[in-house]
Amino acid sequence: MTSSVRIVGDPSRFAEQLVSSIAEHVESRVREALEAARKIVERAYEESASKLESELRRALREAEEQVQAYTAKREVELRKRLAEIRAKAVEEIMSVALQRLREYVGLEAYKEFIKRLLDSALETASRRSRRVIVHPARPDQAIVAELAPRVAAEKGIEVEVGEAVEGAGGFTVRAVEAGLTLDYRLEVILAPALEEARARVLEVLNQ
């Protein structure tokens, strides 16, 4: 027995309604699919954007850390260089001051100062050795060569004037037999005053 569907009314209108219903259903499904696809795309975009932002922040942090490290390193290098420059400037200033000491006090007063140093040095050295050698600092070579024999004669001792040594002024005395060397160069005997002067110069340079 064959079943049949009876269509009531206009068959063509029924067909239109059926097609319209199917079309609406299909359109609805398409809209749902498109909406789902849009959400997937948006989520992917948001995740990508978030990841990109995270990467950018990380890169920025690394760059800032590198800049800070470089800046700190450069600052240390600059401070070290500045300290070296200041130290060099101090030594140059002190060297000039020592070299000009004769001008400050006058030649005769300076020679009297060297003579007193020779008197003390030769007195000490001659007690230790019969052979005493005086080595003048280069700037005072002529003064020491002139005064040493005179001071030695006054004390009744013999003295040799040896080769010049480096120094801002003054001399060294060697008691040969005792293996003893006495240092009477200006930078040694004036050390306390020079340290005070160095501190003052550094204070001025740091202002």
Curated annotation (Swiss-Prot):
Domain of life where this protein originates: Archaea
Keywords tagged on the record: ATP synthesis, Cell membrane, Hydrogen ion transport, Ion transport, Membrane, Transport
InterPro entries (UniProt xref): ATPase_E_C (IPR038495), ATPase_V1_Esu (IPR002842)
Gene3D superfamilies: ATP synthase, E subunit, C-terminal
Subunit details: Has multiple subunits with at least A(3), B(3), C, D, E, F, H, I and proteolipid K(x).
Family named by the database record: Belongs to the V-ATPase E subunit family.
Protein name: A-type ATP synthase subunit E
Organism listed in the record: Hyperthermus butylicus (strain DSM 5456 / JCM 9403 / PLM1-5)
Taxonomic classification: Archaea, Thermoproteota, Thermoprotei, Desulfurococcales, Pyrodictiaceae
